[in-house]
């Protein structure tokens, strides 16, 4: 556990709802357009996004609130999976990041719901058994937009200060 705590400054995480995102954070996300940017909780629920994210990555508004989760989409929604090139690498990273925030979270209820929903996925179970941990951090990803065009992105995940478990993730086209 000490290793995990060292990976995420600030210690334990809590989950948040869209109502708990400050107007300032929402404005920052909106003003980052044309760069796809969204807000994600420690449990990987997508709770806010800008129009560029809808147009260039995915339209989360088409899903019920409880389905707007990066991990659930990665392993259970073909329309989302087909957009991500090198899905295996992206899935491994997402599972490792989820494991880290799960271990650090004060509230396990949402994490448990997600784990239960993914229990039938053999692909998820294989990665979960690897016991790998890491932070979202920054990296590169290739995403196909709604028109099928392949776009190379660099992304960065930034935790909102004084809002443990709230991350702003911004994608910059390369």
Please describe what each predicted stretch is.
Residues 18, 23-174:
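Hydrophobic protein-protein interaction segments
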Residues 1-20:
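Short amphipathic recognition helices of helix-turn-helix/homeodomain-type DNA-binding modules
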């Amino acid at each position: 556990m000490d290793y995990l705590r060292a990976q995420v400054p600030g210690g334990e995480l809590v989950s948040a709802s869209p109502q708990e995102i400050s107007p300032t954070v929402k404005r920052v996300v909106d003003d980052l357009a044309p760069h796809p940017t969204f807000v994600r909780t420690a449990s990987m629920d997508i709770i806010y996004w800008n129009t560029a994210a809808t147009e260039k990555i995915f339209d989360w508004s088409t899903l019920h609130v409880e389905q707007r989760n990066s991990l659930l989409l990665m392993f259970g929604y073909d329309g989302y999976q087909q957009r991500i090139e090198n899905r295996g690498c992206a899935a491994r990273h997402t599972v490792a990041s989820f494991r880290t925030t799960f271990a650090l979270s004060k509230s396990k209820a949402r994490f448990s719901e997600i784990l239960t929903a993914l229990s039938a996925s053999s692909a998820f179970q294989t990665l979960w058994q690897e016991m790998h941990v890491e932070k979202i951090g920054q990296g590169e990803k290739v995403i196909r937009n709604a028109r099928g065009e392949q776009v190379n992105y660099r992304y960065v995940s930034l935790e909102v200060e004084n809002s443990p478990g709230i991350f702003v993730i911004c994608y910059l086209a390369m």
